[in-house]
Amino acid sequence: MAPRPAPNAPAVPELVLSHHPRPVTTTVDAVNERGETVPTPIAGEHPLTLYLDKRELVTLMTLGAAPEALALGYLRNQRIVRSIDELAAVQVDWDVDSVAVTSRSLARDGVTIWELAGRGDELDQRLGRRTVTTGCGQGTVFGGLMDELEAIRLPDGVQVTEAAVYSVMEQVRRHESIYKVAGAVHGCALCTNPLSGDARIVNFVEDVGRHNAVDAIAGSMWIEGVDGHDKIFYTTGRLTSEMVIKCAQMGIPVLLSRSGLTGMGHAIAQRLGMTMIGRCQGRHYLLFTGAQRFVRTGLTS
């Protein structure tokens, strides 16, 4: 059993977060099939350069709706930062299209995360190995793609009902979205997974790339202290190896998509015991992996 902290041990200071979303759409003139000029909303797309303790890591092309959560989720899903407790601040500045993430070690002791004993070499090694993924906009996964799969353990006792799958699809269909207004975005939703089947959307994020949307949800889960073991993850995009691995890292055992899947996504989901359901449209779905969790309820009419 881990020792309890001393009664007078100081609490971890709260993470300082800016709140600087960008407008998600702009309006431009387009000419329709009748030759009429029509004001038309289009999705935003902005560069956002991520710095960790003053070191530039990556420039993300993003809608800009949740930049702080996106930065945190990126660091989480790339396994660059182990815990949100390592971080002191996340500050977005759209004047220079950047987000600066500051570690507690730098804020407290003047020592960057890159200078901590054992961390610098580990991070340099991880950042030196890249896999360009199949995401629209080409996402990148640092480190060996399969390196840490053996350490991931999804919860065994979780079930998901057919009614919950239908409920998620209906909730997403009815949700107000940027896609309905402007198109050109992918959406991801974190949902509850009640045995009653009456699922609820906890968080819904859209971005110009599905890898950004899943990272933003991962960051929000960190900020809010949300556990993934009793949740369902929904995406409008295809179920690739990157999507499966990121959901597994968040501890989410059930993954839904209205789209299809890739061979490596299928293989990794099987290996992890994840329940992966694709081609979800209306009352149709295809259960690909994790049938041990799935409970049919006969709601197909």
Listing of model-derived features with the role each one plays in the protein:
Residues 81, 149, 292-295, 301:
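Residue-level detector of solvent-exposed, low-hydrophobicity positions
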Residues 80-82, 90-93, 147, 224, ...:
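Short C-terminal domain-edge/linker segments immediately following a structured domain
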